[in-house]
Amino acid sequence: MSGNSIGQNFVVTTFGESHGVALGCIIDGCPPGLELTEADMQHDLDRRRPGTSRYTTARREPDEVRILSGVFEGKTTGTSIGLLIENTDQRSQDYSNIKDLFRPGHADYTYQQKYGMRDYRGGGRSSARETAMRVAAGAVAKKYLKQVHGIEIYGFMSQLGPICAETIDLDQIEQNAFFFPDASKLEALDEYMRELKKSGDSIGAKISVIATGVPVGLGEPVFDRLDADIAHALMGINAVKGVEIGDGFGVVTQKGSEGRDLMSPQGFESNHAGGVLGGISSGQPIIAHIALKPTSSISVPGQSMTAQGEMAEVVTKGRHDPCVGIRAVPIAEAMLAIVLMDHLLRHRAQNQDVRSHTPVLGMR
């Protein structure tokens, strides 16, 4: 299997399966001298890990990361950083009854057809369990971005099913299990999820992720545009079926006079483009949104077929998230951080000495 790495200068490679011995990743290209301990990654891993809310999977994994290499006396050495998380709460027997059954909406059928075999235990490599290592690697990138360049990244759930955030209070995001920025909707979210769990069904969500302090100039047109790489990284998250940069699909109904981000010596008047113009960062906040589908691992009976081509009823048992978006916020943050880190290093390699006489614009 190829496709396990992302990045050119800051390269993250992950390995491991949902019910395997462990998950791991290798980070190549991290600059030397960055102070780094397991605690720097553990915070984001705890935000993502299962079993922390009654509305996420009951699988209880501590997700304690270990640094295997690339750090000496508390600082990165510039060599490959090896990270490992052991799997400790697998219940593979939950999947024995579906080992020859394709779960609709999952990668079971496509993995079987592509590779001629598959690890049916929790989805194997296709499981979102793998994203724990992306979060760990993203935490390294986030620390460097903030400490060296003043770039901060944060995400939140902007919609769960029919419930949308109408106000954005950043102080609220970490104060509730939904990473929801609108406190007035928390009771409605709680009630909605209670009824959803009773029905045995699942629901989709929309996650927003923002990076502030990004300098002008990141992005390598034409085929390595910054927004293209961001979309690629975010689309690679399990269950993501749509990505928007800036106003996204909202531009369809905009007129040119409405959607352009007017400029003056005092700064930009708006940010419809989401911080990227012509594939290059404009210095405004990078704004992206992702749409996550409802998981197909539900207890509502459905029709499927076996590996032998026979019709069968499927009822997925096991421990699953009724809304995968609840744990997706730190994953989206991590993927945006990895892309920005990679492009910062690429920009430094080629354009570090470039000086423009045009003043740098901010927001009015």
Curated annotation (Swiss-Prot):
Organism field: Shewanella baltica (strain OS223)
Family indicated by similarity: Belongs to the chorismate synthase family.
GO terms, molecular function: chorismate synthase activity; FMN binding
CDD domains per UniProt: Chorismate_synthase
Region (Disordered): 41-60
Residues where NADP(+) binds: R48, R54
Name of the protein in its database record: Chorismate synthase
Catalysed conversion reaction: 5-O-(1-carboxyvinyl)-3-phosphoshikimate = chorismate + phosphate
Keyword set, alphabetical order: Amino-acid biosynthesis, Aromatic amino acid biosynthesis, FAD, Flavoprotein, FMN, Lyase, NADP
UniProt-listed GO biological process terms: amino acid biosynthetic process; aromatic amino acid family biosynthetic process; chorismate biosynthetic process
Record pathway: Metabolic intermediate biosynthesis; chorismate biosynthesis; chorismate from D-erythrose 4-phosphate and phosphoenolpyruvate: step 7/7
PROSITE patterns: CHORISMATE_SYNTHASE_1 (PS00787), CHORISMATE_SYNTHASE_2 (PS00788), CHORISMATE_SYNTHASE_3 (PS00789)
Role description: This reaction introduces a second double bond into the aromatic ring system.
Binding, FMN: R125, S126, S127, N238, A239, G278, K293, P294, T295, S296, S297, R319
The protein's Enzyme Commission number: 4.2.3.5
Cofactor comment text: Reduced FMN (FMNH(2)).
InterPro entries the UniProt entry points to: Chorismate_synth, Chorismate_synth_AroC_sf, Chorismate_synthase_CS
Gene name in the database record: aroC
Cofactors that this protein relies on: FMNH2
UniProt-listed Gene3D superfamilies: Chorismate synthase AroC
One CC-aspect GO term: cytosol
Description of how the protein assembles with itself and partners: Homotetramer.
